[in-house]
């Protein structure tokens, strides 16, 4: 429709987003909570446009501290590809109770040797206090996540959105 519609959260897997407009041109915006307007990227009818999302931001997770805010610890020596204000999604395939989607990073702590802690840790605005058990998933990954907003130039139409590998 001619009003902005937004996708659910998408975990970033590649550096490029492909948008195909079917039957009518669309305006596209992306980010943590985007709204599409006539000032955004335009994709013409039956056109195909590739949009650069920037480098993929992802990191292994070695510890999760539960609470009204959630603290995520990364392996020593790796750092954090995330900054305050980024939105992230956690996938813990062996402990899915710890999974969360599209939560905001509220703090990044890069200070070493605070209480014997040497890795980078971040705080996320996710309330994990109701999650039971102790985190111990060696395959857990935190990824930057985003949403895509689309607005047609007139009437109704469809837009197909997918992450692709650009070569």
Place the predicted regions along the sequence by residue.
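Solvent-exposed, flexible loop/coil segments flanking beta-strands in beta-rich domains
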Residues: 1-13, 55-56
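Residue-level recognition of short, solvent-exposed, well-ordered loop/turn junctions
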Residues: 12, 42-44, 65, 83
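Short coil/turn motif common to extracellular beta-sandwich-like domains
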Residues: 10-16, 67-69
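Exposed aromatic-hydrophobic patches
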Residues: 7-9, 48-54, 74-75
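Short, surface-exposed beta-strand/strand-loop-strand elements in extracellular ectodomains
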Residues: 20-40
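Short proline/glycine-enriched turn/loop motifs at strand-loop junctions of beta-rich domains
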Residues: 12-14, 20-27, 77-83, 153-155
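Intrinsically disordered, low-complexity Pro/Gly/Ser/Thr-rich segments with frequent PxxP/GP/PP motifs
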Residues: 36-55
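Small/polar beta-strand repeat architecture
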Residues: 55-167
């Amino acid at each position: 429709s001619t009003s902005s519609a937004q996708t659910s959260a998408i975990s970033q897997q590649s550096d490029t987003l492909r948008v195909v407009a079917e039957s009518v041109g669309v305006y596209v915006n992306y980010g943590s909570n985007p709204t599409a307007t006539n000032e955004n990227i335009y994709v013409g009818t039956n056109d195909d446009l590739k949009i650069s999302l920037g480098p993929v931001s992802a990191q292994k997770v070695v510890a999760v501290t539960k609470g009204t805010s959630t603290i995520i610890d990364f392996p020593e020596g790796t750092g954090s590809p995330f900054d305050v204000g980024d939105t992230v999604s956690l996938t813990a395939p062996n402990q899915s109770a710890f999974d969360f989607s599209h939560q905001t990073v509220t703090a990044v702590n890069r200070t070493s040797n605070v209480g014997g802690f040497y890795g980078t840790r971040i705080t996320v605005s996710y309330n994990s206090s109701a999650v039971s058990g102790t985190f111990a998933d060696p395959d857990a990954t935190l990824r930057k996540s985003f949403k895509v907003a689309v607005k047609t130039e007139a009437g109704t139409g469809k837009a197909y959105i997918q992450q692709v590998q650009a070569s």
